[in-house]
């Protein structure tokens, strides 16, 4: 049981840590690399890796939490707030990974270097809107993750009392 709880905290902590670190990678990439296109590719690939970390870690968290509930309470308790938050985090991450990013990639393939397009270009506006959506998704996942970390900490601390 302690090992399950350790895995819950580890998986959630790694995911939250990656979400916090990604903007740092982005800032350094855009300030140090010779072109915005190259920096964008570094950030894109980092984000894809982050999503796989999140999807696998989130799945592990959910599985361990359900098993922990079964052991300690005799039921899986699917509708716990912590499970709902994790499912929302996983859904948002999947939307970004399998919908938003591929659409951004398609625009890049069509237009080439997005940063060279005029600001009023329809492709540029569409890309910027998708980029904004992607940013908001990551912010939402981070906020939900922090809330979930707090709730999980509180739940597991009160379970010991």
Label the predicted regions.
Residues 2-80, 106-128, 160:
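Interfacial loop at the N-terminal end of multi-pass membrane proteins
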Residues 9, 83-87, 137-142:
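Hydrophobic H-region at the start of alpha-helical membrane spans
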Residues 52, 56-59, 88, 133-136:
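Hydrophobic residues within alpha-helical transmembrane segments
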């Amino acid at each position: 049981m302690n090992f399950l709880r350790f895995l819950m905290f580890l998986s959630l902590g790694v995911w939250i840590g990656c979400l916090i670190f990604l903007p740092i990678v982005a800032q350094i990439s855009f300030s140090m690399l010779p072109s915005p296109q190259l920096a964008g590719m570094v950030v894109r690939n980092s984000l894809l890796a982050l999503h796989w970390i999140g999807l696998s870690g989130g799945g592990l968290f959910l599985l361990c939490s359900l098993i922990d509930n079964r052991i300690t309470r005799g039921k899986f308790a699917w509708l716990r707030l912590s499970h709902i938050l994790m499912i929302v985090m996983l859904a948002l991450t999947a939307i970004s990974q399998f919908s938003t990013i591929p659409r951004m990639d398609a625009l890049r393939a069509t237009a080439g270097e997005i940063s060279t397009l005029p600001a009023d270009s329809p492709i540029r506006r569409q890309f910027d809107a998708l980029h904004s959506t992607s940013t908001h998704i990551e912010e939402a996942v981070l906020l939900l993750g922090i809330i979930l970390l707090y709730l999980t900490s509180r739940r597991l601390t009160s379970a010991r009392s």
